[in-house]
Amino acid sequence: MSKAILLLRHGEEPAIQPNLDLSSDGQKRAERLAKFIPKEFGKPGSIFVASPSSSSARCYLTMRPLATALKATVDASFKGEDYAPLAFKLLGDPALRHELVVVCWTHNDLPSLAAYLNVRRKDFPTRWPDDDYDSLFVLSYKNGTRPVVKAMTQPF
């Protein structure tokens, strides 16, 4: 089996800022993702989120229903700007070599993370739109090559 990494943004945020939480739409998205991801891609072996900060816990809150449903843990040990260490872990850790890995991150940092994951610039947005909560990217790796990237829209 080849390695696959799902990259997605956290769920919707409340209109009133600052607010660390998800909006009601974001909470609904998190619940839907908990069903959609295993059904569409299989059970993930690992879930990574940007560590909660003083400005947001939305990545963790988006993945919590998935982790709960799968009785899995969420790795929140990387800060949002820790692209290189996270990419090194995702691509170099033998324990993750053949797993499906889900990564939920902040939209401003996803393009940089994708670059560290060897994604070609033409295959990923250089700037993630502020209003895009629906996109999901599947990075498929075989034998250490650059990933084949499939862009998807979440069906909800």
Which residues make up each language-model segment?
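Conserved beta-strand position immediately N-terminal to the Walker
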Residues: V101
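Short beta-strand segments
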Residues: C104-T106
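Active-site-proximal alpha-helix that buttresses catalytic centers in soluble enzyme cores
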Residues: M1-H98, D109-F156
